[in-house]
UniProtKB/Swiss-Prot annotation:
Name of the protein: DNA-directed RNA polymerase subunit alpha
InterPro entries: DNA-dir_RNA_pol_insert, DNA-dir_RNA_pol_RpoA/D/Rpb3, DNA-dir_RpoA, RBP11-like, RNAP_asu_C, RNApol_insert_sf
HAMAP family per the UniProt record, alphabetical: RNApol_bact_RpoA
Stated role: DNA-dependent RNA polymerase catalyzes the transcription of DNA into RNA using the four ribonucleoside triphosphates as substrates.
Length: 337
């Protein structure tokens, strides 16, 4: 467990992790502060951040199980202590870590008698099992248990539907919520005329990411939501005959790049995240793992720097160069001087 003393600056807004601990493989805890804030600001930020943490963070989970020998979800297999339904519920609890999108396949194929745990799952290369000791089933006789698993990355909670059953496969309620809980509290200080606040934010995660990583992703999602308002004055608002109705045109990535070229405002580079640049998911994930989140981050690297990124190919660099050349008429240097 890590603890740090809380020292609040009276000048510059700062955030800090004041406590961090790992209670188990599937329970991480982090406590953060943000200060100094004006009266009312802490509650505004705390409420928005808590909702973003609980509802906007993406997670990876098992969403479907397939076995040709199982006629229905409530079937009991001779030689297995648990019913099929209980096995599905155990698989629902498996915590996975992955940064890739789309559907991935995994499998389990073991022979009893033995205990079957998450360690027996054969995952795709892009997926990591957080706690390999999680129980799945108990085989009491020398029988084979072979099942196929479907893994997806999503956000929130998605319930299985009755019409979603396919030949021998059974859907599982998808719980893509890495943040188990989030709370915020406020501490006021200062005299009556200059009241200021400290925001305390507590985050519990399931181990697939750290509280600090969750805080970063929630913050980025909130920034993405507010970016259109930063450019509102640059857009035409079309009013209908009804004075109470208006339509704001959608902001595209290309529109934002055009505005940057026109206005030459370097600060705008911080407001365009690489997930808005129409890059392929694989390229985007490689950049994200290297802490390249905005165009400003990207332009701070050379071609040589990008080639050092794990799993990055020359084709990925060429694709990035094409985007920068097309929309910015600039190029990344081959190496840093």
């Amino acid at each position: 467990m890590v603890r740090e003393e809380v020292a609040v600056s009276t000048r510059t807004l700062q955030w800090k992790c004041v406590e961090s601990r790992t209670d188990s493989k599937r329970l991480y805890y982090g406590r953060f502060i943000l200060a100094p804030l004006m009266k009312g600001q802490a509650d505004t930020i705390g409420i928005a951040m808590r909702r973003a943490l609980l509802g906007e963070i993406e997670g990876t989970c098992i969403t479907r199980v397939k076995s040709e020998k199982v006629p229905n979800e409530y079937y009991t297999i001779v030689g297995i202590e648990e019913s099929v339904h209980e096995i599905l519920m155990n698989l629902k609890e498996i915590v996975l870590r992955s940064h890739l999108y789309g559907t991935r396949d995994a499998s389990i194929c073991v022979r009893g008698p033995r205990y079957v745990t998450a360690q027996d799952i054969i995952p795709p290369p892009s997926v990591e099992i957080v706690d390999t000791t999680q129980h799945i089933a108990s085989l009491t006789e020398p029988i084979d248990l072979c099942i196929e698993l479907q893994i997806e990355r999503d956000r929130g909670y998605r319930m299985k539907t009755p019409n979603n059953y396919q030949d021998g496969s059974y859907p599982i309620d998808a719980v893509s919520m890495p943040v188990r809980n989030a709370n915020h509290s406020i501490h006021s200080y200062g005299n009556r005329n200059e009241k200021q606040e400290i925001l305390f934010l507590e985050i519990w995660t399931n181990g697939s990411l750290t509280p600090k990583e969750a805080l970063h992703e929630a913050s980025r999602n909130l920034i993405d939501l507010f970016i259109p308002f930063l450019h509102a004055e640059e857009q035409d608002i079309v009013l209908e005959d009804n004075p109470n109705r208006f339509t704001v045109p959608l902001f595209t990535f290309h529109d934002r790049l055009a505005n940057i070229r026109k206005n030459k405002k370097g600060i705008a580079l911080k407001c365009i995240f690489i997930d808005q640049s129409e890059l392929p998911p694989r390229t985007y994930n490689c950049l994200k793992r290297s802490n390249i989140h905005t165009l400003l981050d990207l332009l701070s690297n050379s071609q040589e720097d990008l080639m050092r990124i794990e799993h990055f190919r020359i084709e990925d660099v060429k694709q990035i160069l094409d985007i920068l050349q097309k929309h910015f008429t600039i190029d990344l240097p081959k190496n840093k001087f």
